Amino acid sequence: MRLNLPISPLLPFPSYLHSFKPGFSLQRASQMILSAFEVDFVFTAAYSLATTFKQPSSHLMIIRPSQHWFRRLFVWHGSVLSKIMFRLSLNVLMSVIAVLSYQWYESLGVHLTLAPFSLLGVAIAIFLGFRNNASYARFIEARTLWGSLLITQRSLLRQIKSTLLSDDAAVREISALMMAFNWSLKHQLRQTDGRADLLRLLPPRWHDQVMNDPSPCNQLLLCMGFWLGEQRQRGVISDIVWQSIDANINHLSQVLGGCERIVTTPIPFAYSLILHRTVYLFCTLLPFALVADLHYMTPLVSVFVSYTFLSLESLAEELEDPFGMAANDLPLDALCVIIERNLKALQGDYPLPEPLKPDNHYNLT
């Protein structure tokens, strides 16, 4: 596949660089590079980035106001550039080595052309596109599950509060169990200690049962079931209402299972490994193919091409685990506070906890 893109006129190349090859010009070099890599760049950008960011999501860990396009070019926080800076430095080093050793290995009859890199670049672009799409699908599924958690708990509390009109204590108890479930799920997904949040939220009679269980989320669902059974035995909830409330509790269990599935089922390692190796081999050898035509421009062009591939590969790796603490993962703390505010507002429990706000670097945990 070839894309006919216009080549704008360029200034002539500095005269001192013409000593490498007679008749060499920057316009000729730009035409050669665009011809070799237009498929790589266009396919990677159009497929990987478009599929990666086609659906907007709220409450990302990087929350930025609208910025001018020029200022966005220099954004550091939230970019994967900080993660790949060392790797790009190695690419610049390989480019310098390629420039310095060009005449030596050229005299040995070693000729590395751009043709194999053009073919390999297409393959890498396809794999990166599917890799980023798979990672973003996991991110979207995780965000959908937490959105479903908020909707289900609001519906659940509304059903209970409208049924138990004169029993505020029972309503507060089930609300506390739901809020404890959210924070416990957050700690389970991030593998952190949730004892402080459980002690803050749990009703006293459920402390020992939940705190001593290796899976607090499962135990909290069981406590909700016990609570619902108690209300049914008291005769304050009819069978029809009981079935409706139990269905919402079952949906909370489905949310838990969906989050556990994402955490325990990563993208197959062999798939990630072959892409990782291919990208790094491509970026390592690329300067030796560019130097014959670009010479001193080799480091600049090589690091730009490498940035495109390495950043997409790094972003896919980051989005693969949407519950982590990376810059572009889900802000589970903020989501838990949002749900807690909603539940407390429904039962009239004021003042509400303050919503979390991004820090000076626009990070929202």
Named regions from a protein language model:
Residues 159-269:
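Structured inter-helical modules in multipass membrane proteins
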Residues 95-96, 100-106, 115-117, 127-131, ...:
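Alpha-helical transmembrane anchor segments
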Residues 1-49:
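Short, C-terminally biased terminal segments at protein or domain edges
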Residues 130-138, 143, 147, 218, ...:
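Short helix-terminus and kink motifs of transmembrane alpha helices
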Residues 153-182, 188, 323-365:
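Solvent-exposed, non-transmembrane helices and loops of integral membrane proteins
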Residues 53-147, 166, 294-296, 341, ...:
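N-terminal juxtamembrane/topogenic regions of multi-pass membrane proteins
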Residues 139-156, 248-256, 262, 326-329, ...:
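Intracellular alpha-helical coupling/juxtamembrane segments of multi-pass membrane proteins
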